[in-house]
Amino acid sequence: MIPISICIIAKNEEKHLHTFLSSIKNHMKDYPHEILFVDTGSTDATKKIASQYTNCIYDFKWINDFSAARNFSLSMASHDWILILDCDEYVTSLNPQGFQQMMEQYPTGIGMITRLNHYQMNGQDSVYTDQVERFFNRKYFHYESIIHEQVVPLSSGKADKVSIPLTVDHCGYMGTVEELQKKVERNNTLLLQMLEQTPDDPYLYFQLGQSYNAIHDVEKTCYYYGKGLEYDINPQIEYAQLMVIGYGHSLLNLKRYKEALFFENIYDEFSFSADFLFLMGLIYMNNALFDKAIQEFLNATRCPKCSVKGINSYLAYYNIGVIYECAGMPNEALNYYKICGDYEPALSGIQRIAK
């Protein structure tokens, strides 16, 4: 088996570190690997905890550049094949044979891991899923961009992107208000610095929208998503889909319901997405176009994949139930509430109707 280096950069991560590193240890115990840990200036017990899992610990002076720290970690690795993980990502599922298969079949490809992002929405824990580039051969790739760094080929050409059987729980959006505020301030300083250099990059507007969304600053979230969508972006690109969905939800949160109806103009480009169809249901629902809302929620349930858990199942059925209940059609509402499983708001709806 070809050994790999798991490269980690960290600063003051004692809160997450035991859970994170033990998740790697448990899932990688039968596969040859090293854990390479780069500390960028911790003042807590981060390095002490890391030393319980690896002897490969290095210091890197923080220079406000995530790619510089990442690339330093690549340079210190013992092996060419690199797996990148962050300390707030806990490995929950991994088949190490997937590494071997990709290395043999796609030696110049990039491995995509599955990330389950946990966050709070309307007071409830929610999850959205994405795939991120994390496994590659350092002979062919490095990192670029000072923030939200990206894997870039060292030479010209387009790399194959391959899903590998590794899933992590990402809890970076689940901190305290103070922790999230500090993280956003750090990130936005770097993003705005990059925006001065490349003012026509829609990806930077997307990331600024993401930052403000994390701290529930709806006005700025809406502004930056909207700026990003002024550019012509391929709907198949994941961040474009996330930006459209985020912009739509921010318009609804700001009660700009009529304005949100312009999403009808991009329906054909994004209707392959359950998340978009669900959003259209919400837009119609908030504009009192209830028949159209029901149709879009039903359309969402016919899509096999979604980013946010429940969008193509119980959340869509629940909203249909709400529409029928408000329309004075309790039997129809009850039918939809009952297929929502143990979703608490649906159970409450069943109890209301039963009274």
Model regions: which residues?
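A conserved acidic beta->alpha catalytic loop
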Residues: 23, 38-49, 62, 86-90
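Short aromatic/hydrophobic "clamp" motif used to bind/position activated sugar donors
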Residues: 82
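Acidic helix N-cap motif at the loop->helix transition within catalytic regions
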Residues: 16-18, 44-52, 94
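Catalytic-site signature of metal-activated, phosphate-bearing donor transferases
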Residues: 71-74, 91-220
